[in-house]
């Protein structure tokens, strides 16, 4: 049973518009390399990067809390659109750059690895999307 379901409607594909059922999201989708001067909007890669970074940050806080560790972290999500040589189409790759600020590197890496196992986005992409984890 779902704990929460997000609902967003997209019209017009990569040159269209998206809206969420609650009205929070309501903006144009534009091709990253085809933006015209003054044109605003986002793209699916930015949206995926935002969602993954936020979700991973929550997972990192969760696994740290389970070990009674207070953590101050920042997650930078990078999502790249790449050519898929296997079928001539496209695929995405993800890099998550994790800055845990004052935490020692060994413990930070342990928590990042645990968060990667726990995070719903990581579970959804596992075996399907190349995901790199970088500790800053």
Swiss-Prot record:
Induction: By heat shock, salt stress, oxidative stress, glucose limitation and oxygen limitation. Expression is sigma B-dependent. Keywords: Stress response. Transmembrane segments: none annotated. One of its GO terms (biological process) is response to oxidative stress. It comes from the Bacteria. Disulfide bonds: none annotated. It holds the Pfam family OsmC. PANTHER family: ORGANIC HYDROPEROXIDE RESISTANCE PROTEIN-LIKE. Involved in organic hydroperoxide resistance. Belongs to the OsmC/Ohr family. This is Organic hydroperoxide resistance protein OhrB. The gene is ohrB.
């Amino acid at each position: 049973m779902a704990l929460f379901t997000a609902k967003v409607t997209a019209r017009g594909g990569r040159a269209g518009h998206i809206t969420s059922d609650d009205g929070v999201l309501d903006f144009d989708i534009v091709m990253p390399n085809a933006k015209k001067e003054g044109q605003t909007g986002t793209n699916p890669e930015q949206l995926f990067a935002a969602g993954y970074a936020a979700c991973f940050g929550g997972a990192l806080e969760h696994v740290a809390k389970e070990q009674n560790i207070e953590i101050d972290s920042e997650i930078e999500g990078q999502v790249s659109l790449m050519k898929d040589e296997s079928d001539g189409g496209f695929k995405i790759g993800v890099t998550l750059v994790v800055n845990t600020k004052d935490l020692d590197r060994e413990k930070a890496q342990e928590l990042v690895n645990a968060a990667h196992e726990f995070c719903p986005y990581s579970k959804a992409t596992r075996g399907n999307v190349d995901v790199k984890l970088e500790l800053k």
